[in-house]
A protein has these predicted regions:
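Asp-based, Mg2+/Mn2+-dependent phosphohydrolase catalytic module
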Residues: 1-9, 115, 129-237
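Generic recognition of short, well-ordered alpha-helical interface segments
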Residues: 71-76, 112, 162, 226
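A short, structure-level motif marking secondary-structure boundaries and short turns
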Residues: 14, 61-63, 97-99, 119, ...
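N-terminal helical cap/lid subdomain that shapes the substrate entry/recognition surface
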Residues: 3-108
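Substrate-recognition element of Asp-dependent hydrolases with the DxDx(T/V) motif
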Residues: 91-140, 148-151
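Residue-level signal for well-ordered alpha-helical scaffold segments within enzymatic catalytic domains
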Residues: 26, 30, 75, 79, ...
């Protein structure tokens, strides 16, 4: 493998750094138990994330005006509860449930892997999450980024090329010496289109319970790993 010259590493956050599936499933179970509701927590969790992805893509394609991740999550949450005929939850409690996405737990390798990489490279979050969410998530998990960048800075969502190009420009780096790390092929394909290097991280249940991404030929990515801790080893070769 050709040695990669990298100075800046950008990380997707939801699913890549944080295990959204396990965290939201637990929050959904707690919510259901608290209000004595009866529904399939796995299906609800998967549909919440799928609904976000659908609205996010509409924003990125110009079919919807810009909405923050918090706003999209709330819109989808209300739709899911309406479909279940659940309409007696107070606004305050709905907001708290929606903020489950602020309380995600990181993958076991995330903190140690990021800490090691930070010793050698500039590391930055580059996420579809709004900035307030990213700050809370990082603070709650004691993750110390060099930079936190949100797609809300650019008024769109990944994989819009202007997100990646804008992020590189803000950190005064260049695309050829920047790497995007993500557990979604579409995210990395967007980074490739912007001229960046890429690293695919396998994460279970990222596209729903037991569902694998149709990621195609992984050889188009510069690195393919099972954990963050592998990235440093590859880059040092």
């Amino acid at each position: 493998m050709k040695k990669l010259k990298i100075n800046t590493i950008f990380f997707d956050v939801f699913g890549t750094v944080f295990d959204w599936h396990k965290s939201i499933r637990q929050e959904t179970t707690n919510f259901s138990s608290k209000y004595k509701l009866s529904f399939d927590e796995f299906v609800f969790t998967d549909n919440w994330r799928a609904g976000f992805r659908l609205l996010q893509s509409k924003v990125a394609n110009g079919q919807r005006d810009y909405l923050s991740m918090d706003e999209i999550h709330m819109e989808v949450l209300n739709q899911l509860l309406d479909e279940l005929n659940i309409n007696d939850i107070s606004k305050e409690n709905l907001v708290n449930f929606n903020e489950s996405w602020h309380r995600l737990k990181p993958w076991d390798d995330s903190i140690s892997g990021l800490s090691d990489l930070k010793n050698h490279y500039i590391i930055s979050a580059l996420s579809n999450g709004n900035l307030s969410m990213l700050v809370k998530l990082s603070k709650n998990s004691n993750i110390h980024w060099d930079s936190i960048l949100s797609t809300e800075f650019f008024g769109t969502y990944k994989p819009d090329p202007k997100v990646y190009l804008g992020a590189v420009k803000l950190l005064e780096s260049n695309a050829e010496e920047s790497m995007m790390v993500a557990s979604h092929a579409y995210d990395l394909d967007g980074a490739i289109n912007a001229g960046m290097k890429t690293c695919y991280v396998h994460r279970p249940n990222e596209f729903g319970t037991g569902i694998s991404e149709n990621y195609g030929d992984l050889s188009r990515f510069d690195l393919v790993v099972e954990s963050f801790e592998e990235i440093s080893g590859y880059l040092k070769k």
